[in-house]
Protein backbone atom coordinates (compact mmCIF):
# COMPACT_ATOMS: atom_id res chain seq x y z
CA UNK A 1 0.00 0.00 0.00
CA UNK A 2 2.85 2.36 0.90
CA UNK A 3 4.55 1.67 -2.43
CA UNK A 4 1.29 2.29 -4.29
CA UNK A 5 0.83 5.67 -2.58
CA UNK A 6 4.40 6.65 -3.43
CA UNK A 7 3.83 5.66 -7.06
CA UNK A 8 0.60 7.66 -7.25
CA UNK A 9 2.33 10.67 -5.68
CA UNK A 10 5.15 10.42 -8.22
CA UNK A 11 2.72 10.18 -11.14
CA UNK A 12 0.70 13.18 -9.92
CA UNK A 13 3.84 15.27 -9.40
CA UNK A 14 5.17 14.29 -12.83
CA UNK A 15 1.85 15.19 -14.44
CA UNK A 16 1.74 18.60 -12.72
CA UNK A 17 5.30 19.37 -13.78
CA UNK A 18 4.52 18.33 -17.34
CA UNK A 19 1.50 20.61 -17.41
CA UNK A 20 3.52 23.55 -16.09
CA UNK A 21 5.60 23.73 -19.28
CA UNK A 22 4.28 25.25 -22.52
CA UNK A 23 0.88 26.20 -21.12
CA UNK A 24 -1.34 27.62 -23.85
CA UNK A 25 -4.09 30.22 -23.54
CA UNK A 26 -6.74 29.16 -26.02
CA UNK A 27 -7.72 32.62 -27.25
CA UNK A 28 -8.75 33.48 -30.81
CA UNK A 29 -5.02 33.66 -31.44
CA UNK A 30 -3.49 31.17 -28.96
CA UNK A 31 -0.38 32.13 -27.00
CA UNK A 32 1.86 30.55 -24.38
CA UNK A 33 2.23 31.61 -20.74
CA UNK A 34 4.63 30.57 -18.01
CA UNK A 35 7.76 28.50 -18.42
CA UNK A 36 8.28 27.22 -21.94
CA UNK A 37 11.03 25.47 -23.84
CA UNK A 38 12.32 25.14 -27.37
CA UNK A 39 10.03 22.20 -28.07
CA UNK A 40 7.01 24.35 -27.26
CA UNK A 41 8.14 26.98 -29.73
CA UNK A 42 8.73 24.33 -32.37
CA UNK A 43 5.07 23.27 -32.08
CA UNK A 44 2.30 24.82 -34.26
CA UNK A 45 1.18 27.58 -34.38
CA UNK A 46 4.41 29.00 -32.94
CA UNK A 47 6.65 26.98 -35.24
CA UNK A 48 5.52 29.08 -38.23
CA UNK A 49 7.54 32.06 -37.01
CA UNK A 50 10.05 30.30 -34.74
CA UNK A 51 11.58 28.07 -37.41
CA UNK A 52 11.66 30.84 -40.03
CA UNK A 53 13.43 33.31 -37.75
CA UNK A 54 15.69 30.64 -36.29
CA UNK A 55 16.93 29.79 -39.77
CA UNK A 56 17.22 33.49 -40.68
CA UNK A 57 19.70 34.06 -37.87
CA UNK A 58 23.27 34.11 -39.16
CA UNK A 59 25.45 34.70 -36.09
CA UNK A 60 28.98 36.02 -36.52
CA UNK A 61 31.35 32.99 -36.39
CA UNK A 62 34.12 35.03 -34.72
CA UNK A 63 31.80 36.13 -31.92
CA UNK A 64 30.35 32.64 -31.54
CA UNK A 65 33.86 31.25 -31.12
CA UNK A 66 34.42 33.59 -28.18
CA UNK A 67 31.03 32.77 -26.66
CA UNK A 68 31.82 29.05 -26.83
CA UNK A 69 34.64 29.54 -24.34
CA UNK A 70 33.07 32.22 -22.13
CA UNK A 71 29.28 31.84 -21.99
CA UNK A 72 29.18 28.50 -20.16
CA UNK A 73 29.88 30.25 -16.82
CA UNK A 74 26.58 32.13 -17.09
CA UNK A 75 22.86 31.43 -16.91
CA UNK A 76 20.17 33.21 -18.90
CA UNK A 77 16.54 34.10 -18.31
CA UNK A 78 14.51 35.16 -21.33
CA UNK A 79 11.06 36.76 -21.04
CA UNK A 80 8.91 37.03 -24.13
CA UNK A 81 5.41 37.27 -25.48
CA UNK A 82 4.57 34.74 -28.16
CA UNK A 83 2.04 37.38 -29.28
CA UNK A 84 4.78 40.04 -29.64
CA UNK A 85 6.50 40.82 -32.94
CA UNK A 86 9.81 41.74 -31.30
CA UNK A 87 9.81 38.47 -29.34
CA UNK A 88 9.00 36.47 -32.44
CA UNK A 89 11.96 38.05 -34.19
CA UNK A 90 14.58 37.93 -31.42
CA UNK A 91 13.91 34.79 -29.37
CA UNK A 92 14.46 32.38 -32.30
CA UNK A 93 17.74 34.21 -32.95
CA UNK A 94 18.67 33.76 -29.28
CA UNK A 95 18.17 30.00 -29.55
CA UNK A 96 20.19 29.97 -32.78
CA UNK A 97 23.07 31.79 -31.08
CA UNK A 98 22.98 29.55 -28.00
CA UNK A 99 22.92 26.40 -30.13
CA UNK A 100 25.85 27.68 -32.20
CA UNK A 101 27.76 28.55 -29.01
CA UNK A 102 27.03 25.05 -27.64
CA UNK A 103 25.38 26.63 -24.61
CA UNK A 104 23.50 23.99 -22.56
CA UNK A 105 19.81 24.87 -22.71
CA UNK A 106 19.28 23.64 -19.16
CA UNK A 107 21.05 26.89 -18.18
CA UNK A 108 18.38 28.88 -20.04
CA UNK A 109 14.99 29.66 -18.48
CA UNK A 110 12.40 30.92 -20.95
CA UNK A 111 9.18 32.48 -19.66
CA UNK A 112 6.20 33.55 -21.78
CA UNK A 113 4.17 36.47 -20.43
CA UNK A 114 0.45 37.18 -20.66
CA UNK A 115 -1.10 40.00 -22.67
CA UNK A 116 -4.50 40.31 -20.96
CA UNK A 117 -5.05 43.64 -19.21
CA UNK A 118 -5.50 42.12 -15.73
CA UNK A 119 -2.29 40.09 -16.02
CA UNK A 120 -0.39 42.29 -18.45
CA UNK A 121 3.13 40.97 -19.02
CA UNK A 122 2.79 38.70 -16.00
CA UNK A 123 3.51 34.98 -15.74
CA UNK A 124 1.19 32.56 -13.89
CA UNK A 125 4.19 31.44 -11.83
CA UNK A 126 5.34 34.98 -11.09
CA UNK A 127 8.78 34.38 -12.59
CA UNK A 128 8.91 38.00 -13.78
CA UNK A 129 8.53 39.36 -10.23
CA UNK A 130 11.62 41.25 -9.03
CA UNK A 131 13.07 40.97 -12.54
CA UNK A 132 11.82 44.45 -13.55
CA UNK A 133 10.50 43.25 -16.89
CA UNK A 134 8.39 45.82 -18.73
CA UNK A 135 9.29 45.32 -22.41
CA UNK A 136 9.56 42.04 -24.26
CA UNK A 137 11.69 40.32 -25.07
CA UNK A 138 13.98 40.84 -22.11
CA UNK A 139 17.04 38.60 -22.03
CA UNK A 140 18.92 38.67 -18.71
CA UNK A 141 22.45 37.35 -18.23
CA UNK A 142 23.43 36.06 -14.78
CA UNK A 143 26.69 34.94 -13.20
CA UNK A 144 26.76 33.25 -9.80
CA UNK A 145 23.10 34.17 -9.37
CA UNK A 146 23.66 37.91 -9.90
CA UNK A 147 22.44 39.87 -12.89
CA UNK A 148 25.23 41.00 -15.21
CA UNK A 149 23.12 42.92 -17.73
CA UNK A 150 20.16 42.52 -20.06
CA UNK A 151 18.94 42.98 -23.60
CA UNK A 152 15.63 44.86 -23.65
CA UNK A 153 13.28 44.53 -26.64
CA UNK A 154 16.03 44.24 -29.24
CA UNK A 155 19.84 44.01 -29.31
CA UNK A 156 22.03 47.05 -29.89
CA UNK A 157 24.08 45.17 -32.51
CA UNK A 158 23.10 41.50 -32.53
CA UNK A 159 22.22 38.88 -29.93
CA UNK A 160 25.70 37.37 -30.01
CA UNK A 161 27.55 40.72 -30.03
CA UNK A 162 25.41 42.07 -27.19
CA UNK A 163 26.00 38.96 -25.06
CA UNK A 164 29.75 39.30 -25.60
CA UNK A 165 29.62 43.00 -24.71
CA UNK A 166 27.75 42.17 -21.50
CA UNK A 167 30.38 39.62 -20.56
CA UNK A 168 33.06 42.26 -21.20
CA UNK A 169 31.20 44.75 -18.99
CA UNK A 170 30.77 47.20 -21.84
CA UNK A 171 27.03 47.38 -22.42
CA UNK A 172 24.10 49.72 -21.80
CA UNK A 173 20.69 48.26 -22.71
CA UNK A 174 17.78 49.95 -24.42
CA UNK A 175 15.37 51.71 -22.03
CA UNK A 176 18.10 52.29 -19.44
CA UNK A 177 16.44 55.64 -18.71
CA UNK A 178 13.13 53.94 -17.95
CA UNK A 179 14.87 51.38 -15.75
CA UNK A 180 16.49 54.24 -13.81
CA UNK A 181 13.08 55.84 -13.23
CA UNK A 182 11.69 52.49 -12.12
CA UNK A 183 14.48 52.16 -9.57
CA UNK A 184 13.92 55.74 -8.41
CA UNK A 185 10.24 54.96 -7.85
CA UNK A 186 11.21 51.93 -5.77
CA UNK A 187 13.62 54.06 -3.75
CA UNK A 188 11.29 57.02 -3.12
CA UNK A 189 7.85 55.41 -3.16
CA UNK A 190 4.96 56.90 -5.15
CA UNK A 191 4.10 59.69 -2.69
CA UNK A 192 7.60 61.16 -2.52
CA UNK A 193 8.07 60.58 -6.26
CA UNK A 194 4.87 62.58 -6.88
CA UNK A 195 6.14 65.46 -4.75
CA UNK A 196 9.36 65.57 -6.76
CA UNK A 197 7.60 65.15 -10.12
CA UNK A 198 8.63 68.50 -11.62
CA UNK A 199 12.28 68.03 -10.65
CA UNK A 200 12.31 64.45 -11.95
CA UNK A 201 10.76 65.61 -15.22
CA UNK A 202 13.50 68.23 -15.66
CA UNK A 203 16.33 65.87 -14.78
CA UNK A 204 15.90 62.11 -15.31
CA UNK A 205 12.80 62.49 -17.47
CA UNK A 206 14.55 64.80 -19.92
CA UNK A 207 16.50 61.79 -21.23
CA UNK A 208 13.39 60.07 -22.60
CA UNK A 209 12.84 60.27 -26.35
CA UNK A 210 9.32 58.81 -26.42
CA UNK A 211 6.54 57.79 -24.07
CA UNK A 212 6.30 54.08 -24.88
CA UNK A 213 8.61 52.77 -22.16
CA UNK A 214 6.84 54.50 -19.26
CA UNK A 215 3.48 53.69 -20.85
CA UNK A 216 4.20 49.97 -20.81
CA UNK A 217 5.73 50.14 -17.34
CA UNK A 218 2.55 51.76 -15.99
CA UNK A 219 0.38 49.00 -17.47
CA UNK A 220 2.65 46.33 -16.00
CA UNK A 221 2.52 47.95 -12.56
CA UNK A 222 -1.24 48.40 -12.66
CA UNK A 223 -1.75 44.72 -13.50
CA UNK A 224 0.65 43.81 -10.67
CA UNK A 225 -1.52 45.75 -8.16
CA UNK A 226 0.94 48.64 -7.95
CA UNK A 227 -1.72 51.17 -8.88
CA UNK A 228 -0.17 54.14 -7.06
CA UNK A 229 3.13 53.60 -8.85
CA UNK A 230 1.34 53.19 -12.20
CA UNK A 231 -0.66 56.39 -11.76
CA UNK A 232 2.35 58.42 -10.63
CA UNK A 233 4.57 57.27 -13.50
CA UNK A 234 1.75 58.03 -15.95
CA UNK A 235 1.45 61.54 -14.52
CA UNK A 236 5.15 61.94 -15.26
CA UNK A 237 4.59 60.62 -18.78
CA UNK A 238 1.81 63.16 -19.36
CA UNK A 239 4.09 65.95 -18.14
CA UNK A 240 6.96 64.85 -20.37
CA UNK A 241 4.84 64.30 -23.48
CA UNK A 242 1.89 66.72 -23.29
CA UNK A 243 1.14 66.40 -27.02
CA UNK A 244 0.70 62.61 -26.87
CA UNK A 245 -2.78 61.09 -26.47
CA UNK A 246 -1.64 57.72 -25.12
CA UNK A 247 -0.53 58.76 -21.62
CA UNK A 248 -3.61 60.97 -21.13
CA UNK A 249 -5.97 58.17 -22.15
CA UNK A 250 -4.22 55.73 -19.84
CA UNK A 251 -4.28 58.12 -16.88
CA UNK A 252 -7.94 58.91 -17.57
CA UNK A 253 -8.78 55.20 -17.48
CA UNK A 254 -7.01 54.86 -14.13
CA UNK A 255 -8.90 57.85 -12.74
CA UNK A 256 -12.18 56.38 -13.96
CA UNK A 257 -11.30 53.02 -12.46
CA UNK A 258 -10.83 54.74 -9.09
CA UNK A 259 -14.12 56.58 -9.38
CA UNK A 260 -12.46 59.96 -9.95
CA UNK A 261 -14.78 60.82 -12.82
CA UNK A 262 -14.12 64.57 -12.75
CA UNK A 263 -10.37 64.05 -13.17
CA UNK A 264 -11.02 61.46 -15.87
CA UNK A 265 -13.30 63.85 -17.73
CA UNK A 266 -10.66 66.60 -17.73
CA UNK A 267 -8.14 64.22 -19.27
CA UNK A 268 -10.55 62.92 -21.92
CA UNK A 269 -11.29 66.52 -22.93
CA UNK A 270 -7.58 67.22 -23.20
CA UNK A 271 -7.35 64.29 -25.60
CA UNK A 272 -10.14 65.79 -27.72
CA UNK A 273 -8.21 69.05 -27.87
CA UNK A 274 -5.37 67.07 -29.45
CA UNK A 275 -7.64 64.97 -31.67
CA UNK A 276 -11.21 66.15 -32.01
CA UNK A 277 -12.48 62.85 -33.41
CA UNK A 278 -10.84 60.53 -30.88
CA UNK A 279 -13.43 57.78 -30.47
CA UNK A 280 -12.10 56.47 -27.16
CA UNK A 281 -12.35 59.87 -25.48
CA UNK A 282 -15.77 60.62 -26.98
CA UNK A 283 -17.24 57.31 -25.86
CA UNK A 284 -15.69 57.70 -22.41
CA UNK A 285 -17.26 61.13 -21.92
CA UNK A 286 -20.66 59.75 -22.92
CA UNK A 287 -20.18 56.95 -20.41
CA UNK A 288 -19.20 59.40 -17.68
CA UNK A 289 -22.26 61.55 -18.39
CA UNK A 290 -24.51 58.61 -17.49
CA UNK A 291 -22.88 58.10 -14.08
Set out the residue ranges of the language-model regions.
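Alpha-solenoid helical repeat scaffolds
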Residues: 215-216, 246-250, 266, 282-284
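Non-catalytic, surface beta->alpha helical segment in thiol-disulfide oxidoreductase systems
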Residues: 135, 142-178
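Helix-start (N-cap) detector for alpha-helical repeat units in TPR-like alpha-solenoids
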Residues: 211, 227-228, 245-249, 279-280
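Residue-level recognition of tetratricopeptide repeat
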Residues: 219, 253-254, 287
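Thioredoxin-like thiol-disulfide oxidoreductase module
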Residues: 107-141, 165-167
Amino acid sequence: MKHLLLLLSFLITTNVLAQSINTQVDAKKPYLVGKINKEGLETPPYSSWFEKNYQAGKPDPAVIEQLQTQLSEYTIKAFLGTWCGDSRREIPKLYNVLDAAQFPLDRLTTVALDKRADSYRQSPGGEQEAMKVFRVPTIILFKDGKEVNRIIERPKVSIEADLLAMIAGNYTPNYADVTALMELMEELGPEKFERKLDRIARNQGAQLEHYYGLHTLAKVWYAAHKQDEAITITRLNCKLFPQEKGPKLLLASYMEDRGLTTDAGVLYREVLQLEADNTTAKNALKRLDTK
